[in-house]
Curated annotation (Swiss-Prot):
<dbReference type="InterPro" id="IPR036388">
    <property type="entry name" value="WH-like_DNA-bd_sf"/>
</dbReference>
<dbReference type="InterPro" id="IPR036390">
    <property type="entry name" value="WH_DNA-bd_sf"/>
</dbReference>
<dbReference type="InterPro" id="IPR005119">
    <property type="entry name" value="LysR_subst-bd"/>
</dbReference>
<dbReference type="InterPro" id="IPR000847">
    <property type="entry name" value="Tscrpt_reg_HTH_LysR"/>
</dbReference>
<comment type="similarity">
    <text>Belongs to the LysR transcriptional regulatory family.</text>
</comment>
<keyword id="KW-0804">Transcription</keyword>
<dbReference type="GO" id="GO:0003700">
    <property type="term" value="F:DNA-binding transcription factor activity"/>
</dbReference>
<keyword id="KW-0678">Repressor</keyword>
<feature type="domain" description="HTH lysR-type">
    <location>
        <begin position="1"/>
        <end position="58"/>
    </location>
</feature>
<protein>
    <recommendedName>
        <fullName>HTH-type transcriptional regulator TfdS</fullName>
    </recommendedName>
</protein>
<keyword id="KW-0010">Activator</keyword>
<dbReference type="GO" id="GO:0032993">
    <property type="term" value="C:protein-DNA complex"/>
</dbReference>
<keyword id="KW-0614">Plasmid</keyword>
<keyword id="KW-0238">DNA-binding</keyword>
<dbReference type="GO" id="GO:0003677">
    <property type="term" value="F:DNA binding"/>
</dbReference>
<keyword id="KW-0805">Transcription regulation</keyword>
<dbReference type="Pfam" id="PF00126">
    <property type="entry name" value="HTH_1"/>
</dbReference>
Length: 295
């Protein structure tokens, strides 16, 4: 049974005449007659009572007409869905993320993508950078979002944008730093950095930034994550540096101020298999790059 047989049958049933069906289909009458006969032979039933005035559905034909319409609609829908999938307009995108990217970058990306591609679905999983790389290679995620990914063969790391750095300090220390929020000014401050795992990391970048500015950092602690660092800062154990997305969230007993140094910024990056041809990933990257161009 072929889709063209179904189309010819439905047209003849709706027109009540094979010649009229042929004109509607923009073909000659003999192919329509032949294909309807072939369909009847395949089904083993007569679909039409034929007369000089035209054709009339038999009970079997009337029952089959509704099924034929549904099959044709399903065929059209299947074609549309397969074409949409090939363009990345539908399908599931699996994303791994780590760290402070979840505060602003990930929500902004997901919002932009779902607005642009409403037929796609998204899943998020918190995972360390090493696990993200493993998951990319295993095909369990399509994309990683984070910072400071190591260079790996077959893996692309694409910087999406840079975030300014802010000093986070307790209220009394913040008053002293506010007049000169620079890397050089931090040389006498106790630094609480994060994260402890996943090197190279944000902590390594802060240390490198300070050394490039001619400052040897006084690191008193490297803790698990940003929340632990801010907890120590609130307790007066030192100061820390955080991206703008973290500074935007108010916390008790912690004050933030943007750093004056032009170099005080860190990237947010996307990572994915270099040779990936997953359409929904390509659609996501297109949306992300358009957003990058608008910043």
């Amino acid at each position: 049974m072929e889709f063209r047989q179904l189309r010819y049958f439905v047209a003849a049933a709706e027109e009540g005449n094979v010649g009229a069906a042929a004109r509607r289909l923009h073909i000659s009458q003999p192919p329509v007659t032949r294909q309807i006969h072939a369909l009847e032979q395949h089904l083993g039933v007569l679909l039409f009572e034929r007369s000089a005035r035209g054709v009339q559905l038999t009970p079997a034909g009337a029952a089959f007409l509704e099924d034929a319409r549904r099959m044709l609609e399903l065929g059209r829908t299947s074609v549309d869905r397969s074409r949409a999938a090939s363009r990345g307009e539908i399908g599931q995108l699996d994303i791994g993320y780590l760290g402070t990217a979840i505060y602003q970058t990930v929500p902004a990306l997901l919002h932009a993508f779902t607005q642009a591609v409403p037929g796609a679905t998204l899943s998020l999983a918190l995972m360390p950078k090493v696990r993200q790389i493993e998951a990319l290679r295993a095909g369990t995620i399509h994309l990683g979002v984070g910072r400071f990914y190591p260079q790996e063969p077959g893996i692309t790391v694409e910087h999406l944008h840079y975030e300014r750095l802010y000093i986070a300090a307790g209220s009394s220390i913040a008053r002293q730093l506010r007049q000169d929020p620079t890397l050089l000014r931090l040389k006498s401050e106790s630094l609480v950095l994060f994260p402890k795992e996943g090197r190279p990391s944000f902590a390594d970048e802060v240390i490198a930034l300070m050394r490039r500015a001619g400052v040897e950092p006084r690191v008193t602690a490297i803790v698990e994550d940003v929340n632990a660092a801010l907890g120590l800062v609130a307790a007066g154990a030192g100061v820390t540096l955080v991206p703008a997305s973290v500074a935007a969230i108010r916390r008790p007993f912690v004050r933030t101020m943007e750093m004056a140094d032009a170099s005080a910024k860190v990237p947010v990056s996307l990572t994915y298999l270099t040779d990936s041809r997953v359409p929904v990933l390509r659609a996501f990257l297109d949306v992300a790059r358009r957003g990058k161009g608008q910043k």
